[in-house]
């Protein structure tokens, strides 16, 4: 059982649980083979009671964490100042997200007149309501399509467009994503990227771009049937399903996160599931590779390099050609470079051939 995204300010989030961590044991009992509902039942309990969970993470020893159960209060939007810039964090997309985002942007503008840009952090945001994703995208756009929803028939298309009124007045915007960003997060990132409203920084998102419809059986007496009825497409016509949103600047948050992306046996995405719906456009998700920029062993692990780089992009006015060089503690690799263990071997090369 893999963690999709730990909730902000939850016991697991505060304990350092990350997207992609695998739950291997709960209170000493092996969790292998348990269903989602069975794992949820074991994790739930009385407020104040503790549960011991063992997590597996790539390249590290099993980690045992004691979590104290509490009521989880979901705050959809938070924000703070980062120097001359505003930082906006959306943890989930619910019925309050649009209103909370508007209030947070206005508060930051009052606290710091003359703001020079915003970072919109959607990392480890597993999604939520479509309407909330549309509201968030619309908050940063003056016009243009946000997303389209397409069914099996050619004429079965529903389009959603922005209304006039960019709450930030067109200030430079950076969207942060990673492999824990899914569904509604991908709709927002895809819209703002395709409409050239934002620069996307981080790692390729999860790739959850399908629409499910729930059909009650006998009025709900016999349960319900959930079927996939459509796919989401970005304004440029790209399917989100299985492919995800690729960043304009690929940056890993930590050395450990870079290892996850480069691991041949681990692709944290919708594409990793054998039963996942195809993208429908023939495109494929990029396989394991070395992230373009990743912290090295000497990088301060308490720092958030992805956020640092997002702020660098804002300082460059959103122009990647003017971006400051990565610091010495960052490993910079050519985009798309495969890790040594997954690189293709040229079988036609002579035995005495040596690499350049």
Regions found by a protein language model. Name each.
Residues 73, 78-356:
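C-terminal "post-core" interaction segments
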